[in-house]
UniProtKB/Swiss-Prot annotation:
Domain of life where this protein originates: Bacteria
Quaternary data: Forms a heterotetramer with UvrB during the search for lesions.
Function field: The UvrABC repair system catalyzes the recognition and processing of DNA lesions. UvrA is an ATPase and a DNA-binding protein. A damage recognition complex composed of 2 UvrA and 2 UvrB subunits scans DNA for abnormalities. When the presence of a lesion has been verified by UvrB, the UvrA molecules dissociate.
Family matches, as HAMAP family: UvrA
Protein name in the entry: UvrABC system protein A
Residues covered by the ABC transporter domain: 331-610, 630-959
Keyword Repeat: yes
One Gene Ontology term, aspect cellular component: cytoplasm
GO biological process: nucleotide-excision repair; SOS response
Family classification: Belongs to the ABC transporter superfamily. UvrA family.
Length: 974
């Protein structure tokens, strides 16, 4: 084999890999698949990508290396045939509130350039374009008029300002000027009548009187320059005899004609300045349109587009509460009588009692409590038991008081307390567009840059394709290359199924799949060749309908001359690959071997490959023999959901069932389920402060006692958090060790076995097991602590043994081994067995939370819920729980979810995976398209009902699946 044609890996042992030898064809689309935790990412990211990136960075100078994060050398004997590597992982792009889809894809940078070069500023006062001209352009415009036209050349020194202007007129006379036009009438300067200083005046200085003829240029240029100096960049050519004929232009005149022309005069400006309002724009440069630059950012919100403001709904969370029972939330916790006595005084003035509910108060009384008495003085009587006094003053109002204290306080605690009652609102100065008025006055095709970023990518693409029709020849020439870059990038975003996003969408609000596909679009835009791309499940969050477009994109990346390695479980992706590598046979310590490799057909033919069995149909996720009965009375009903793109949606979710919310990306699933139902229900039932999206009402919440969103966020942000601490298994483990005879003899308490507190932990590394050493030109090195040798505890703590194992040995066991080891200790065993049940038997009991993938973190949370005593009245909400799961893992996950439902709970999932949708009792399909074209209920009912609906894309793909695979017994979950 020639090394140039293959990436040759020898002896890969990173994480759980078992000395893997592998030859991967270059310039091909390669899919790595296998069970969750089998070692796919260890091979693709931690070995191949890490080595490719490390070698590239190593080739740079020491100075350059200090700015780049350098990967550790993977545990591998040899890798040949590598190219510089780029990884596109499942991480949200950026939590920075200044990062948007437009900035990440660089489309916004090109838009700034386009607006700076061909945008036309408009006056907010007149709505007319503001143009800047050179003296030569002004001269050309005048010479282009009909020969013999008589003109006054005027300098408008005063525009609509009050004053007498005697001094200014005297100065003009000294300089040799003789005539002025005051408020529309011509005068000799000596004869100007006294001006009333209470009224606004217009004064134009007559600089010259000319008759248009071809040899006028030099004199005209001098006169215009004098005007521009006198009037701060403005000059007027006014017709002495007749007005400018309608539509009159000399040859070439249309291109030069100023939009500031009337039939009596032509106004010239050498600056971007409105002659009417004086609204000026500095020189138009790309930075004027940057909300990350003080030159362009809105000064009120500093370019964020939002402001923190006190939200009246958080001040009065429950309108049915009485004033004396804490209706005013910021005052509710205080034990001081001050607040009640304040309300009593306001009650006397506005005619209400403190026993009244908020909903019973008059509008005037509500406004007085919230926003103050606006100068009306109120007599307050205060008595705190120690002293009594009376004061008469206006009442400031709850909201102004909180806003003032928030601005004035230096205490972080006070600020945090007040922020509990604040919400983000669009900035009133820029309406959420993030830019200064000057930037928003510049338009192309009657739209400013902010309006275009608010369009969906689909609409923006159409707008940019049509816009050059409105350009003149010069503008077209300038814009051509910029438009090409913008159109290409928008096309790539369309191709990866993101046409429903807006360019203004905050990067932090994107799902992992969306942000990965955005980075994918940016990579295609860069047009690199000879690169090794490593991708992590790019199909996440993508409906089957858009899958083909994504796969086309990956093939396009390959056809440019790149090697594309994709870690993926999606059936279509595996079948479209040039080469498939199946890692297994199971997860964790039971994985790490190459089970099968070759074409998709080779994988299907391999009897050892679990993936092959699912692809060929030998195994499958079974459709339930019968679905649960749907109760007509026990149901949740969401009425009038209108958040984001939802169009007044009302839908029922039957309680005690497994419901799937489906639809294309951007159809409104997350808005309906997470932003509306979950936030509203958790606010009502759990007392959370989350802000739900707009809706009318939700019925049926009385049937629930808990609402839990099991998402893919990390279970802990520090290496000290692990599955044992999160699920609560670590507490009984520590208790058990503290109860052992050796521990009792030494007087050890459970705290002795914690690595978070002094006592039992190793103080050299403070219980971390490793010590970080900063290396400025190399990656930071974590060296194993030489005192405890990575065990995290001191020697005395490690002397306490159970069945010959110390607490450190227990943390190093896999969950499966731990469950067996503690088989006689139900408090520990039961919690660890739930982790095994959700398919996490392969992770370590003490594995650092930061090393778990999103899918693994979600299943740890699921295990925690399973181990709780069931009330049968919980609503579980999961957003794409099959992320990172192999077909076989999906079958296991479904068993767990259905077990939660069997306990009487309700499980609702947002899901694109047809294997999950086909097992649901009830399906709500939103769409039909993404973005503006979505937000409606397309179909609702059992999966068999969904396939009948012609408009439902989910139904079309589900129909194929149900017809292709007949119902079978539960062979899959063997």
């Amino acid at each position: 084999m020639s090394d140039q044609k293959f990436i040759s890996i020898r002896g890969a042992r990173e994480h759980n890999l078992k000395n893997v030898d592998l030859d991967l064809p270059r310039d091909k689309l390669i899919v790595m698949t296998g069970l969750s935790g089998s070692g796919k990412s260890s091979l693709a990211f931690d070995t191949i990508y890490a080595e490719g990136q490390r070698r590239y960075v190593e080739s740079l100078s020491a100075y350059a290396r200090q700015f780049l994060e350098m990967m550790q050398k993977p545990d591998v004997d040899q890798i040949d045939g590598l190219s510089p590597a780029i990884s596109i992982e499942q991480k949200t792009t950026s939590r920075n509130p200044r990062s948007t889809v437009g900035t990440v894809t660089e489309i916004y940078d090109y838009m700034r350039l386009l607006f700076a070069r061909v945008g036309i500023p408009y006056s907010p006062a007149t709505g007319l374009p503001i143009e800047s001209q050179t003296v030569s352009q002004m001269v050309d415009r005048v010479i282009a008029l009909e020969e013999g036209t008589r003109l006054y050349i005027l300098a408008p020194i005063v525009r609509g300002r009050k004053g007498e202007y005697r001094k200014e007129l005297a100065e003009l006379q000294k300089k040799g000027f003789q005539r002025v036009k005051v408020d529309g009438t011509f005068y000799e300067i000596a004869d100007v009548p006294p001006l009333d200083k209470k009224y606004k005046h217009d004064i134009d200085v007559v600089v010259d009187r000319v008759v248009v003829r071809p040899d006028l240029s030099t004199r005209l240029a001098d006169s215009l320059e004098t005007c521009l100096k006198l009037a701060d960049g403005l000059a007027i050519a006014e017709f002495a005899d007749k007005p400018l004929p309608v539509g009159e232009t000399a040859e070439g005149g249309s291109a030069n004609k100023s939009a500031n022309e009337t039939h009596e005069r032509i106004l010239f400006s050498e600056k971007f300045a409105c002659p009417v309002s004086g609204f000026t724009i500095p020189e138009i440069e790309p930075r004027l349109f940057s909300f990350n630059n003080p030159f362009g950012a809105c000064p009120t919100c500093d370019g964020l587009g939002t402001q923190q403001a006190i939200d009246p709904n958080l001040i009065i969370p429950d309108e049915s509460a009485a004033l004396k029972d804490g209706a005013v939330a910021p005052w509710a916790r205080s034990s001081s009588p001050y607040y009640n006595q304040t309300l009593e005084a306001l009650g006397k003035a506005y005619g209400f009692k403190v026993s009244a509910r908020w909903s019973e108060l008059s509008e005037e009384a509500r406004q007085a409590i919230l926003y103050g008495t606006k100068g009306r003085e109120i007599t307050f009587h205060y008595d705190d038991g120690l002293r009594s006094y009376q004061t008469t003053k206006p009442f400031e109002g709850v909201i102004p008081n909180l806003e003032r204290r928030w601005k004035e306080t230096d205490s972080a605690w006070s600020r945090e307390e007040i922020e509990r009652f604040m919400a983000s609102t669009p900035c009133p100065a820029c309406n959420g567009y993030r830019l200064k008025p000057e930037a928003l006055s510049v338009k192309i095709g009657k739209k400013h840059i902010g309006e275009i970023t608010e369009m969906s990518i689909r609409k923006a693409d159409a707008w940019f394709r049509d816009i050059d029709g409105s350009f003149n020849e010069k503008q077209r020439e300038i814009a051509a290359r910029i438009l090409k870059e913008i159109r290409e990038r928008l096309q790539f975003l369309n191709d990866v199924g993101l046409d429903y996003l807006t360019l203004a969408r905050n990067s932090g609000t994107l799902s992992g799949g969306e942000s990965q596909r955005i980075r994918l679009a940016s990579q295609i835009g860069s047009g690199l060749t000879g690169v090794l791309y490593v991708l992590d499940e790019p199909s996440i969050g993508l409906h089957q309908r858009d899958n083909a477009r994504l796969l086309d994109t990956l093939r396009h990346l390959r056809d440019l001359g790149n090697t594309v390695i994709v870690v993926e479980h999606d059936e279509d992706a595996i079948l479209t690959a040039d080469y498939v590598v199946d890692i297994g046979p199971a997860a964790g310590v039971h994985g790490g071997k190459v089970i099968a490799q070759g074409s998709p057909q080779d994988i299907m033919a391999n009897t050892n490959s679990l993936t092959g069995k699912y692809l060929s149909g030998a195994m499958e996720v079974a459709v339930p023999a019968e679905r649960r009965k749907i109760s007509k009375t026990k149901r949740l009903r969401v009425v009038g959901a209108r958040g984001n793109n939802l169009k007044n949606v009302s839908a029922d979710i039957p309680l005690g069932t497994f419901t799937a919310v489906t639809g294309v990306s951007g159809g409104g699933k997350s808005t309906f389920l997470i932003e509306t139902l979950f936030k509203a229900a958790s606010r009502r039932i759990m007392g959370s402060r989350e802000h739900p999206a707009e809706y009318d009402r939700i019925e049926g919440l009385e049937f629930l006692d808990k609402v839990i969103d099991i998402d893919q966020s990390p279970i802990g942000r520090t290496p000290r958090s692990n599955p044992a601490t999160y699920t609560g298994a670590f507490t009984p483990i520590r208790d058990w060790f503290a109860g052992l005879p050796e521990a009792k003899a030494r007087g050890y308490q459970p705290g002795r076995f914690s690595f978070n507190v002094k006592g039992g932990r190793c103080e050299a590394c403070q219980g971390d097991g490793v010590i970080k050493i900063e290396m400025h030109f190399l990656p930071d090195v974590y060296v194993t602590c030489d005192v405890c040798h990575g065990k995290r505890y001191n020697r005395e703590t490690l002397d306490v043994l159970f069945k010959g194992k110390s607490i450190a040995d227990v943390l190093d066991m896999t969950v499966e081994e731990g469950a067996e080891f503690f088989s006689a200790v139900p408090a520990v065993r039961d919690k660890l067995e739930t982790l095994v049940k959700v398919g996490l038997g392969y992770i370590k009991v003490g594995q650092q939370a930061t090393t778990l993938s999103g899918g693994e973190a979600q299943r740890v949370k699921l295990a925690k819920e399973l181990s709780r005593r069931a009330t049968g009245r919980t609503l579980y909400i999961l957003d794409e729980p099959t992320t990172g799961l192999h077909f076989h893992d999906v079958a296991k996950l479904l068993e767990v979810l259905h077990e939660l439902v069997e306990q009487g709970n309700t499980v609702v999932v947002i899901e694109h995976n047809l294997e999950v949708i086909k097992t649901a009792d009830w399906v709500i399909d939103l769409g039909p398209e993404g973005g503006d074209g979505g937000g409606e209920i397309v179909a609702v009912g059992r999966p068999e009902d969904i396939v009948q609906e012609k408009r439902s894309y989910t139904g079309q793909f589900l129909k194929e699946l149900l017809e292709r695979r007949p119902k079978r017994s539960s062979q899959a979950a063997e």
